Amino acid sequence: MLHTLPHCASGVDFPALLRLLKEGDALLLLQDGVTVAIEGNRFLESLRDAPITVYALKEDIDARGLGGQISDSVVRVDYTEFVRLTVKYANQMAW
């Protein structure tokens, strides 16, 4: 399943998101959600042991001036790769 997070993590039920993550899922951070990808962010730390891949939309990272602060554990994607993720994961959950 592809989970999308367009908000700051404090604005969603993050414990529920963590509970629903399954092996092989992906979490795509976009809009203000890219702040989760900042190195040392407590929400990112809670994702470290999850059996998922965390992606962040590069354009949103750049728009917020966060390029140098993003964790190396987060995969940066552009809009084309965003579309590929939506095709790859038939099921999606928007937070």
Curated annotation (Swiss-Prot):
Pfam families referenced in this protein's UniProt entry, alphabetically: DsrH (PF04077)
A GO-annotated cellular component: sulfurtransferase complex
Keywords assigned: Cytoplasm, tRNA processing
Domain of life: Bacteria
UniProt KW Flavoprotein keyword: no
Keyword tRNA processing: yes
Subcellular location: Cytoplasm
GO terms of biological process kind: tRNA wobble position uridine thiolation
Main location per the UniProt record: cytoplasm
Family matches, as HAMAP family: Thiourid_synth_B
Protein task: Part of a sulfur-relay system required for 2-thiolation of 5-methylaminomethyl-2-thiouridine (mnm(5)s(2)U) at tRNA wobble positions.
Similarity annotation: Belongs to the DsrH/TusB family.
Subunit structure: Heterohexamer, formed by a dimer of trimers. The hexameric TusBCD complex contains 2 copies each of TusB, TusC and TusD. The TusBCD complex interacts with TusE.
Protein name (Swiss-Prot/TrEMBL): Protein TusB
Organism for this UniProt entry: Salmonella paratyphi B (strain ATCC BAA-1250 / SPB7)
